[in-house]
Design a protein with these regions (language model features):
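Short beta-strand element of the alpha/beta-hydrolase
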Residues: 66-75
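Primarily recognizes the serine-hydrolase "nucleophile elbow" in alpha/beta-hydrolase
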Residues: 112, 116-185
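C-terminal catalytic histidine-bearing segment of alpha/beta-hydrolase fold enzymes
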Residues: 214-253
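N-terminal cap/lid segment of alpha/beta-hydrolase-fold proteins
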Residues: 1-64, 153
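Conserved alpha/beta-hydrolase "acid-adjacent" motif
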Residues: 197-206
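Short beta-strand/loop motif that positions the catalytic acidic residue
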Residues: 184, 190-192, 196
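Short amphipathic alpha-helix adjacent to the substrate-entry channel of hydrolases
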Residues: 82-101, 209
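Catalytic nucleophile-loop/oxyanion-hole region of alpha/beta-hydrolase
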Residues: 81-85, 101-130, 233-238
């Protein structure tokens, strides 16, 4: 990343970072500093692996008892681009009444961390004030791969070791080249730009067509001219896609 001020923030592989949204997020985090971050690993686990100290969930609260979403930023498994690729999504979902969590994961152990995050929320649902059923997994780029993998019923069991955790109701994914298809995949909403030089819109479209052929609900959007990493797409042709994704989630809950 680069930039000396919030207005100048730049993240590798991302476009259209909105300074106003960045400021809004920082103000939200400051206002909720005492309760916004949740540790998902125990103190003993963090002592054994110090990197786990920087791993956890930022909680953007919605309505009590509402379903939850876990948002996973991309960053090519080199870093976590949360300020543009998960915090804005989580904040907007909370404004719509949903309980949203943005995961800060270890790039080398991303799938393990997402599995732990889902387990943590499931086991602490009452304490957190969220519904443990009907949840969704969101992600952009590398984060979309994470959402797709943990959205698969078989991988969910393999990575959590738990049979009591339900499969996600929907996977909401942006701009990724993930192309694995399985009958155990969840309902999937995908969006991408036609000028994405990293994740081909055709690859995403073909995957969703294959899922549809298996009887899995899908919805696909390719936005003309948009590059990789457009986030919420504020002021762009993709603006408002997040509400379409929420509708898809609700239809499959």
């Amino acid at each position: 990343w680069s930039g000396e001020t919030l207005e100048d923030l730049r993240l590798v592989w991302y476009n259209y970072i909105d300074p106003d949204k960045t400021v809004e997020i920082c103000n939200y985090l400051k206002a909720h500093a005492d309760s916004v971050f949740l540790d998902i690993y125990t103190e003993s686990e963090k002592q054994d692996d110090p990197q786990k100290r920087n791993t956890g969930l930022f909680f953007f609260r919605g309505n009590p008892g509402a379903p939850f979403a876990v948002c996973n930023a991309g960053g090519a498994f080199a870093y976590v681009g949360a300020m543009h690729d998960s915090f804005p999504h989580a904040l907007e979902l909370s404004k719509l009444g949903y309980n949203a969590f943005a995961l800060i994961y270890r790039p080398d152990d991303a799938y393990e961390d997402l599995a732990r995050a889902i387990t943590y929320i499931h086991d602490h649902a009452d304490e957190l004030g969220v519904s443990a059923s009907g949840y969704s997994l969101w992600g952009g780029s590398a984060g979309a791969r994470m959402a797709a993998v943990l959205g698969n019923a078989n991988y969910l069991y393999q990575l959590t070791g738990r049979e009591d955790i339900p499969q996600t109701s929907a996977v909401i994914m942006q701009y990724t080249g993930y192309n694995t298809v399985s009958p155990q995949d969840a309902a999937t909403y995908a969006c991408v730009g036609t000028s994405d030089g990293i994740a081909s819109w055709r690859t995403m479209q073909r995957r969703l067509q294959s899922l549809s052929a298996l009887g899995i609900p899908t919805e696909f959007h390719a936005y003309n001219g948009l590059p990789h990493g457009f986030g919420l797409g504020t002021g762009m042709v993709a603006e408002g896609w997040i509400k379409d994704a929420v509708r898809f989630w609700e239809e499959n809950r």
